[in-house]
């Protein structure tokens, strides 16, 4: 009987959104549109950076990887969420949960380190422009990017491995729209203290290191900007950093609320708005934040549009 109960509770029901038929249809359309825009926007930015030699610099390599990470985040969460709007059971197995969280944790941890790498790149470009190619070499850029993804994989392996020490024998309703670790911990019949402690330590360490790197970089950047005598130089430096800082604020604000706050295991209705911001809104906005405020990207886009327009005129 114990074995039967244990097996039965290896399947869960996601109950994060409304069951109202009209609202379900509306939400499906909205989130499907967001999903398409997110994937197309981010993949387009990756393709733009990959295909134009002018953008093969450390900053754009980091931005390209951030765009790739954001598209992976959308692909890890949204398809199952859209399926559940019209699925009667809204069921997800423990193994599906583990896979979904593994990919989400990997890409979001990589995101943290990539954002810190972009901050360091901006620090070198603004505070030490003459030494930029020495301090921010292509080799270092590749090492930082590779390290971000390795750290993401290791971080997710730890948490996914610890999920399988838990036993689920009570309610199997997850009050969320995707399978995160905290909602699973709330359903565990085994005390999840170790899981919660490891989550707090490792997620906290990642946050402290990456946020610390971002803040220190921006502190030096601000000090350098205020010392600039040229108004044009100051405006250009502010413009360069504004888009990155906007993305950092949205991303870290939501992730801090989700994983670093006290009383993590309290019932998670309040998790959903922050999770929507973290997993859906931020990946949607990032390609527009990075491209629309970036003169290099806009310049390349204009050249592409002019080329397409001129080719169209010739064909006519």
Swiss-Prot record:
<feature type="transmembrane region" description="Helical; Name=6">
    <location>
        <begin position="238"/>
        <end position="258"/>
    </location>
</feature>
<feature type="transmembrane region" description="Helical; Name=3">
    <location>
        <begin position="100"/>
        <end position="120"/>
    </location>
</feature>
<keyword id="KW-0297">G-protein coupled receptor</keyword>
<keyword id="KW-0812">Transmembrane</keyword>
<feature type="topological domain" description="Extracellular">
    <location>
        <begin position="259"/>
        <end position="271"/>
    </location>
</feature>
<dbReference type="InterPro" id="IPR000725">
    <property type="entry name" value="Olfact_rcpt"/>
</dbReference>
<dbReference type="GO" id="GO:0005886">
    <property type="term" value="C:plasma membrane"/>
</dbReference>
<keyword id="KW-0807">Transducer</keyword>
<dbReference type="GO" id="GO:0004984">
    <property type="term" value="F:olfactory receptor activity"/>
</dbReference>
<feature type="topological domain" description="Extracellular">
    <location>
        <begin position="1"/>
        <end position="25"/>
    </location>
</feature>
<feature type="transmembrane region" description="Helical; Name=1">
    <location>
        <begin position="26"/>
        <end position="46"/>
    </location>
</feature>
<keyword id="KW-0472">Membrane</keyword>
<keyword id="KW-1133">Transmembrane helix</keyword>
<keyword id="KW-0675">Receptor</keyword>
<keyword id="KW-1015">Disulfide bond</keyword>
<keyword id="KW-0325">Glycoprotein</keyword>
<feature type="transmembrane region" description="Helical; Name=4">
    <location>
        <begin position="140"/>
        <end position="160"/>
    </location>
</feature>
<dbReference type="InterPro" id="IPR000276">
    <property type="entry name" value="GPCR_Rhodpsn"/>
</dbReference>
<feature type="transmembrane region" description="Helical; Name=7">
    <location>
        <begin position="272"/>
        <end position="292"/>
    </location>
</feature>
<feature type="topological domain" description="Extracellular">
    <location>
        <begin position="76"/>
        <end position="99"/>
    </location>
</feature>
<dbReference type="GO" id="GO:0004930">
    <property type="term" value="F:G protein-coupled receptor activity"/>
</dbReference>
<dbReference type="GO" id="GO:0005549">
    <property type="term" value="F:odorant binding"/>
</dbReference>
<dbReference type="Pfam" id="PF13853">
    <property type="entry name" value="7tm_4"/>
</dbReference>
<feature type="topological domain" description="Cytoplasmic">
    <location>
        <begin position="121"/>
        <end position="139"/>
    </location>
</feature>
<feature type="glycosylation site" description="N-linked (GlcNAc...) asparagine">
    <location>
        <position position="5"/>
    </location>
</feature>
<keyword id="KW-0552">Olfaction</keyword>
<feature type="transmembrane region" description="Helical; Name=2">
    <location>
        <begin position="55"/>
        <end position="75"/>
    </location>
</feature>
<feature type="topological domain" description="Cytoplasmic">
    <location>
        <begin position="218"/>
        <end position="237"/>
    </location>
</feature>
<comment type="similarity">
    <text>Belongs to the G-protein coupled receptor 1 family.</text>
</comment>
<feature type="disulfide bond">
    <location>
        <begin position="97"/>
        <end position="189"/>
    </location>
</feature>
<feature type="topological domain" description="Cytoplasmic">
    <location>
        <begin position="47"/>
        <end position="54"/>
    </location>
</feature>
<feature type="transmembrane region" description="Helical; Name=5">
    <location>
        <begin position="197"/>
        <end position="217"/>
    </location>
</feature>
<keyword id="KW-1003">Cell membrane</keyword>
<keyword id="KW-0716">Sensory transduction</keyword>
<feature type="topological domain" description="Cytoplasmic">
    <location>
        <begin position="293"/>
        <end position="316"/>
    </location>
</feature>
<dbReference type="InterPro" id="IPR017452">
    <property type="entry name" value="GPCR_Rhodpsn_7TM"/>
</dbReference>
<comment type="function">
    <text>Odorant receptor.</text>
</comment>
<protein>
    <recommendedName>
        <fullName>Olfactory receptor 5K2</fullName>
    </recommendedName>
</protein>
<feature type="topological domain" description="Extracellular">
    <location>
        <begin position="161"/>
        <end position="196"/>
    </location>
</feature>
């Amino acid at each position: 009987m114990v074995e039967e109960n244990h097996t039965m509770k290896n399947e869960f029901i996601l109950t994060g959104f409304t069951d109202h038929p009209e609202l379900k249809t509306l939400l499906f359309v909205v989130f499907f549109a967001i999903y398409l825009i997110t994937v197309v926007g981010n993949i387009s930015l990756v393709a733009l950076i990959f295909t134009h030699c002018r953008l093969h610099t450390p900053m754009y390599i980091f931005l390209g990887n951030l765009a790739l990470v954001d598209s992976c985040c959308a692909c890890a969460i949204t398809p199952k969420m859209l399926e559940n709007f019209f699925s009667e059971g809204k069921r997800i197995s423990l193994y599906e949960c583990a896979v979904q969280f593994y990919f989400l944790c990997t890409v979001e941890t990589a995101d943290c380190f990539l954002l810190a790498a972009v901050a360091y790149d901006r620090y070198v470009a603004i505070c030490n422009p003459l030494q930029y190619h020495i301090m921010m070499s292509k080799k270092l850029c590749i090492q930082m990017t590779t390290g971000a993804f390795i750290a993401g994989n290791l971080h997710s392996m730890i948490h996914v491995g610890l999920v399988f020490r838990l036993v689920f024998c009570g309610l199997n309703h997850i009050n969320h729209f995707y399978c995160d670790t905290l909602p699973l911990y709330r359903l565990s019949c085994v005390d999840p203290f170790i899981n919660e402690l490891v989550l707090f330590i490792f997620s906290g360490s990642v946050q402290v290191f990456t946020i610390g790197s971002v803040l220190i970089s921006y502190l030096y950047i601000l000090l350098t900007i205020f010392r600039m005598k040229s108004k044009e130089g100051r405006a250009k430096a502010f413009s360069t950093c504004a888009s990155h800082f906007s993305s950092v604020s949205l991303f870290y604000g939501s992730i801090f609320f989700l994983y670093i706050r006290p009383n993590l295991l309290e019932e998670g209705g309040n998790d959903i708005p922050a999770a929507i911001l973290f997993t859906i809104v931020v990946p949607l906005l990032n390609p527009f934040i990075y491209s629309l405020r970036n003169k290099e990207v806009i310049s390349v886009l204009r050249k592409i549009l002019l080329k397409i327009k001129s080719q169209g005129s010739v064909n006519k």
